Each structure stands twice: as structure tokens, then as C-alpha cells.
Amino acid sequence: MEPTLQSAMEEQLKILREISDRLAAQEARWRSRESTVTQHSRSIHDLEVAMASAPSATLRAELDAPVAVTYERLDATEAASAARVSALESTTATFDMLFDNSDIVEKFNAEVVADDWGGLFGQHAHPLDSGGARLLLPSAALPFASATDTAFSSIYGVECGTIHTYTAALTRPAALHKPLVVAHAKCSTPGHNRVCAETQRQGPRQARRQCRLRVHVRRLHFTGLQLHVRQHGRRRQHVVHVQRVLPGAELDGRGLRLPWPRVAHGDRPFRAHLQLHHIDPDGGGGGGHGITPPERWLSRAGAYNAAAPNEVDVLRWTLKGVLWPRVTYCIAGWIDLGDGVAEGADHAVRVRFRVDDGCVVEGGTVCAESGSWTEIKGVFRLKRNARVMEVYVQGAVAGIDVKVTDPQVFATNVIQNLAYVDFFTKHFDWAVFEKEFRWYHVEDAAKVFDKMLTKGEEAPSVQRGVVMTAVAHNLLVQALFMDGRASDAYVVLEEMQNNGPFPDVFTYTLKVLKNGQWAEEESTILVPGDIIGVKLGDIISADTRLLEGDPLKIDQSALTGNFCICSIVAGMLVEFIVMYPIQDMVYRPRIDKLLVLLIGGIPIAMPTVLSVTMSIGAYRLAQQGAITKRMTTIEEMAGMDVPCSDKTGTLPWTKLTVIKSLVDVFQRGADQDAVILMDARASCTKNQDAIEATIVSMLAAPKEACAGVQEIQFLPFNPNDKRTAVTYMSLIYALSPGKA
């Protein structure tokens, strides 16, 4: 054997020995940190785990009991960790275990290493193997995992026919800011309602001790994820975070992929998971408004499979004594289109609720995209006690799988302002938010909104709801919402400050004659000698000399600081540039005095009056079926004589067209082609606007408009006459016989 090959093999063997030693050390370290499980007596309460096909849902107090599990730090004796643990807040937490559908779940453990938590869908995960199933937990899922230490967690399986209770203490930082991925198994017993009633009277600490019930495991089923944290010395129980992770789940940058069973009809399988939440303005799970604590909430898992596309699918859900009137609830979930849908395709999916065959609430509409999970959220409020609630899922899909899990406390920054919530809950009945928080009024405006939702139109926005509410209740609304262009102006000012006195954002385009052709050029690159064409509304930042044209008016205040308008001529002109724009503005001190007089002459209430006037105009337009998105739209509509739109009342395409068959002829002997030709001759063929370009394009050849005529005078469009006019002379050619 050659020396070189032998040395290479020895090097490879050395590397393999190092890898083997590292694996052995890692295995020894895992086993040394394995925690113990304390098994209690098996004689107290035998609770049956609820299946997915559970009977009609009842109160959570009659159905559910959590399997209490606690994680305990085992490396607290180390010097580096001991000092850190003493500074942490010790909190007792109740976790719900996650199992699969097998009768026996093997014990499994894993080392959770601190890592970056990449948002709700982190890309880093560690596998936990259990009886062939694969469970992925985010590496930073446990709240006591940090960048400076390694936390060890062991999850133990439950054997059929045995009773287990897991309790201990969780050591965590004072601020629980990272989500903890856990799950729960549903249990029931006839005497559980009496136990919960007794514990509620004895106080939260006694309730915590007595609700740690032993579970007789017969069969387990995946139902969802939740975390209840009870803090010492506080009377409130909080649900910190909700997230679903099942065996075989994959976490990647595009979303959370779950191996849920799906039902496919045709080529569009579909599945969805919904969770019902409760929004408590006080911030506590068992806070005010007569709301029952989480232990008394409904718990139900069910599924309904559609059999036809575009079918209204329903999941009947009994809610007697659970949902309360005048309390805001949130419905949230994840939607996934099946593999049969083409990559990148999307479908609109809508969730609706019907309570007691009466009130129909829109729970949210989302455009689900194939290849990833799409989140859907909605908020609703009930006017009266609800006994039965039906969940509908509408969408362009052939099969669905809807799963509804426990109600949870839902918190968001939008509803943290109690004054904001109090104002809207007094005047609004329910809300839906997709990308923004939207409120809908309960008065007459709600009928208009319901018609819009029935027709499939866009849901009303916050601005329209606030305006209509203010008008209906005689409320004064001023400057609640800022126009988006105000922020754009701020960006422009910043760019102007950074780029100098002539930033690129202030450039304008003009028609410039180049090589005998008219082309659009930026006004800042004009040079002396360029010939430009100007029409109404053009801005020229240069000194020019008039070559030809008709009467027009030019505002020179931008160049000289003079606020007076110089009357020269009115219409189209061609100018010859003499010099580049002047660099300095001539400032006149008298402008200060004029500005003071101008501002002093404006009434202080004018902005309010204008805002209210525009709001009333928007409300009256809404009564007639015209919905305006911006207040300035009303002013723009005042300058229109004939609005053109499609059958839905919108303008989806910013392109003008003329239908030849609809052209009216008012002169005998004339036809539609002659009228179109006359219109084309009255249009500008060089520096055209949108209307002129549309009319000229109707001719077979654009040059046909000027063929055989000589233009004498052209009057461009002006706002007073609202027309263009041209004076021309026909050219008559005398042909003499000769050779062609």
C-alpha cells in the first residue's frame, strides 16, 4: 500500500473515532440528565380521554381535565446556573400533554438547545421520536431556554390502564415572552363538575391543588395545543400562547405543515383548523363581564367533510351557557390547500357563523395559497345568549376538514386601549379583521354592509364605519385617520433634505422634439435649444421663449416668488428654452405679511366644518349605493358629467375605450365614420392626452386625421368650454393626365 493512501486512511479512521467518542459522550450526558416521574395513587378519579368522535359538547367543567406536567431544571447545582436560577421567578404551570392515537405511547426525551426563535414559524427544530411518530418542537419553545444555557426536557408517555399525575415546578424568567409548545388530552367524568364547583369557592390555590386529577388512559387523540400559567399571589389564570404541532409536522420558512388527514374530492383537497378565542378587555382569563374561567369553557373537536365544490359546509356546535352576549370572541385557524392544487394557486375561503338560526356573522375571508398554511382570523359579538352555533366554511374547494378546539384568551395591541374598545363596543356589534381591524355598525348602516357581504363585495373599512357611526349618532369626528399621502410627503421632504435643492422626486416630464419626433423627457435634463410642447397643467422649471401658440396664462410664482399670474395667451404653445432653471429663489419680505393676513382670515373651525361636510356627503352617497374610499374622491366626482363604470360600479382598468356603435349622429347624410374622423381632427396628434389618444386610435391609420387638410387654428381643451376645436382648410389637388 502506498504511504500516501495509508496516511489518508489513518486520518479518516481518526476522524471516525472522534465522532464516535462525541456521540458516546452526548448519549451519556442525556442519560445523566434524565428526570424522574412521580406516580401517585390510582384510586381517586378515573377519567376517560375524549375521542375525536366525542358526543355533543358540554361545558368544559364537565368534559375536560388537564394532565398536569411540569419541567424541572436538573442543572441548578452548577455554579454558573445556580446564580441564574436564584434570580428567576419560580412559577407553577400546568401543561397539557401531547399523545398520538396509539394505545401505548413509549417514553421519549430530547435535549432542547437554545436557539433563535424565528417568529411564529421558526426554522430551527429538534425531533422527538415516539413509537415511530416524529414530533418537531421549536428549539426555543421552552421559556427557560436562552442563549446562555442549555435546558433539558423529558416528556413521558402514558401506558394504557394506568393512572398518572405529573406535577413539579417550572423555573422561568419573570417575563414569559416566548411561546411554549404543549398539547392537551381531553378527559371527562360525571363527578368533575362538582369538584370544580367546590374548588371555585375555596379560592385559586385550593382549585389548583384539587384540579390535578389523575387520568385513566384508555385512548388518546390529538386535539390541540394550549398553556395555562397560574402565578402565585394572583387571582387570574392566563392562557399565554396557542400553537398546534402534531407528529410529522414540519416547520419551515413558508409556514407550518401538518400531516392532518384530508378528504379529497376531485383535484382540490382542502383542510382547515379553527380555534375559538375569547377577548377579555380586562386582560385576564377569568376577568370581569361575568365570563367563566377557562376550566368552564367549551371543549369540542369535530370535522365535517365537503362533497362538492363551492358548497356551504357546516359543523354544528352546541354552545349552551358558553358564549355570552356583549362579549367579543375571536375565531382563528389555519387553512391549507391540498397537493392537488397547482403550486402558487390560491382560492378565497370564507368562514361564517349562524347562531340559533338567526344572526349570521362573517368570521373572516382569506385568500389561501397552495403549498403553505394560511392564517384566518375573525371577531364577533352576540346580542343574546346563544345555545347553538353553526360554523360554515365557504370556498372554491372540493373537500374540507374543519377542526374546532377550545376557546382561548386572545390579546392584541389593537384592543389594548380600553377607551377605544369602550367607544366601539357601545356603537358596534361585531368586527372582522383580516389585514386590519374592521368594525361594523349595528344601526341602519349594518344593513348596507350586510348587502355588500351578500354580494361578495369588499368589506367596509374602519374609515367608512367611523364616518357612518358619527353621522348616525351626531358625533363630531375630526382627524381620526390620516391620509396615506401625508406620510408620503414626509418621505419626499426627507429625500429633498438628503439629495439637495433639486432631488429626483421633483422631476416632471415634458414632450420634447428630438430628431423630428416628439418624446417624453424629464424637465431637469432640458438644455438651451430644446423645443418643447406645452399643454394645460404642464410645469416647466426653465426660462423659455414663445415660438408659436394661442392665448394662454402662465404662473411664474415658482420661479420668481411672485404670486401674481401673468396673462399671456391660453392654449397650446411651443417654446424655445433660453436658459437652465435659476438656482436661487427671489424671496420677497412682503409675503410674510400676506401670509399672516391670509391665515388670520381663515376661521378656526373651517377644517372641522369641511371634514363634517365631506362626511355627510359620504354618508348620503352610501345611502344611494355609492361607496367612496377617500374623501377627496367626492371632490373629484364633482368635476365629472358622465361617470363610466362596469356592472359592479367600479373602474378596474384605467384605460379609456370608445364604442363605435354608440356614437350618435345628429346631421343628415353623415355617418359614424365621419363623426369619428372629425373628432380625430379636433384632437391633438402630437402631445396627446388619454382622451385624444383613444379617439385617434379608432382610425385605421393615425395619420388619416391630418390627411388632406391644413390646420389654421387649434383651441385645446379648457375647463370652461370642456371641448377642443380646430379650424382647418381642405386641400384640393388638381391631377393632370400623365404617366404614373
From Swiss-Prot:
Spans of PPR repeats, please give: 469-503
Q: Does the keyword Cell membrane apply?
A: no
Provide the alphabetized UniProt keywords.
Transposable element
Q: Which GO terms describe its molecular function?
A: nucleotide binding
Which domain of life does the protein's organism represent? Answer: Eukaryota
Check the record and name the InterPro entries matching this protein: ATPase_P-typ_cyto_dom_N, ATPase_P-typ_TM_dom_sf, ATPase_P-typ_transduc_dom_A_sf, HAD_sf, Pentatricopeptide_rpt
Sorted alphabetically, which Gene3D superfamilies does this protein's record hold?
Answer: Calcium-transporting ATPase, cytoplasmic domain N, Calcium-transporting ATPase, cytoplasmic transduction domain A, Calcium-transporting ATPase, transmembrane domain, Galactose-binding domain-like, HAD superfamily/HAD-like
Pfam families in UniProt: E1-E2_ATPase
What function does this protein fulfil? Answer: Bs1 is probably an active plant retrotransposon.
Instruction: State the name under which the record lists this protein.
Output: Putative Pol polyprotein from transposon element Bs1
The organism is Zea mays
